From Swiss-Prot:
PANTHER family: 50S/60S RIBOSOMAL PROTEIN L14/L23 (PTHR11761), LARGE RIBOSOMAL SUBUNIT PROTEIN UL14M (PTHR11761:SF3). It comes from Geobacillus sp. (strain WCH70). GO terms for molecular function: large ribosomal subunit rRNA binding; structural constituent of ribosome. Binds to 23S rRNA. Forms part of two intersubunit bridges in the 70S ribosome. Gene3D superfamilies: Ribosomal protein L14. This is Large ribosomal subunit protein uL14.
Length: 122
């Protein structure tokens, strides 16, 4: 479960490698984020020369979770790590490439640009 103080790997080439969740968006008392939810995070680790710098506050969408998600047909999908993609305010990704698989649930939440850039949609 992704909550405040959770650390996520960044699955794009925006320059950030790891972020720490500051807030889960979507309601005043919202505690947990799942796949497709937007969080506010700060960059804890970044690569030199990237678009995003260490210490910067960014918005990100969760694309993979260890907890997984239940689908309407009764199946579950879960991943080996918790990962996110850094986004702009218009839901478009800051980077130009996405690394690793992403869940199909992002399509329902209207993150079509991330779906199209991802190498695999599960």
């Amino acid at each position: 479960m992704i909550q405040q103080e959770s650390r996520l790997k960044v699955a794009d080439n925006s320059g950030a490698r790891e972020v720490l969740v500051i807030k889960v968006l979507g309601g005043s008392g919202r505690r947990y984020a799942n796949i497709g939810d937007v969080v506010v995070a700060t960059v804890k680790e970044a690569t030199p020369g990237g678009v995003v710098k260490k210490g910067q506050v960014v918005k990100a969408v969760v694309v993979r979770t260890k907890r997984g998600v239940r689908r309407s047909d009764g199946s579950y999908i879960r991943f080996d790590e918790n990962a996110c993609v850094i986004i702009r305010d218009d839901k478009s990704p800051r980077g130009t490439r996405i690394f690793g698989p992403v869940a199909r649930e992002l399509r329902d939440k209207d993150f079509m640009k991330i779906i199209s850039l991802a190498p695999e949609v599960i």
